[in-house]
Amino acid sequence: NDEFDQYLKRFNYTFKNENKETAGYAILKNKKIILAMDIGPSPIGPQSNDYQSGALSFEIISSGKKLISNSGYFSNKQNKLNKLSKSTALQSTLVIEDYSSCSFKKLKSLGYLVDQGLKIMNKNIVFEDNYWKISASHDGYLKKFGSIHNREIEFYPEQTKFIGTDKIVRKNKDKNVKFDIRFHLDPDSKVMKTQDN
């Protein structure tokens, strides 16, 4: 409420976000690098009409320029690109058997809403001067494939080095699943192969 905000301002109260999580995103940053990862559950109902199924997707920004990003959102709900832009394949994350981690249903007035969502588990955020880590799991593939997706991204600021680990934990280990791990590079990014790959 407005009165409470004025009270806090008058007595110079400021609050620091110690857990580094805002609206379902972990955001770690220093003067040069920003690492952001989607670690929030999928919304439900009308709140999901603009949701992109990008659980555990991430973006890296260096000196104000995106290096790894998600593909963006097409907001015109009458266009086929709207549904496509909500798919997991267009996010920088792991995809099993070309299925999105959430399913959508179309409602004429609201567009595509999350029909079957996902939960986030095992969230962990570490933010120290010389070491950052964001890790979490989601159950978006549990019902269809009996699988949990775990992701961990580490950053070593002194070396400007990122290490990412994805794991698929499966109930039925007898059946193989096809998966892709996608990293969408900003069109202005320049990438080169190093000697150690």
Model-derived segments and their meaning:
Residues 1-69:
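Carbohydrate-active enzyme catalytic cores, enriched for enzymes
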